[in-house]
Amino acid sequence: MSPESRREQLLELGTQLLSTRTLDEISIEVLAEEAGISRGLLYHYFGNKQEFHIAVVRRAVEQLVAITAPRDIENPLEQLAVSLGAYLDYVVENYTGYVSLVRAASGGNDELRTIYEEGRRALVDRIFEVTGPDGMDALGVPDTPAVRLLADGWSAMTEAVIVAWVVDDHGISREELLQRLAGALPAIALA
């Protein structure tokens, strides 16, 4: 196996482990054991635990951005609800690791925070890029710096609501949650 393929395999295993473990629980030792290789080989590919964690988090964020990619849906609110559904599914399937990633990003690690913020920025930017001039504008939501700021706030609220909903749905169905969150963006932006 080529070095690039082996590194890719280890990153994939790391992101799989992140779905059921916290970032702190994914050590070089755990990954080496799961992969059936020596710790030294892992250090060869990642240098140290921090570099490994950064690579795994970057890969997890890339996967999240990829799975929430827009579908070919003309109605911008429906499109947003579908993307939010993919996001919700990702959080459900990777709850432990996702919450760990959010906490690590809000902690003292600048590199993890940067990766997390880049992912969030990509998701918010996509709302405006994908919907284009006939999308959010069709809802009466212009693409302005002020609206982008409010969209950032909506994104943070959406993340908090989804993480809480996974633990306790508070009597709100999945569909209702997605529709309310999608509808909240224009409501917040136009308030």
Each predicted region: which residue ranges?
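Short amphipathic alpha-helical elements of helix-turn-helix/winged-helix folds
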Residues: L13-L17, Y90, R126
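Amphipathic alpha-helical packing segments from all-alpha helical-bundle domains
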Residues: V65, D110-D137, P145-A156, A160, ...
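Amphipathic alpha-helical segments used for helix-helix packing
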Residues: V92-T114, F128, A160-V167
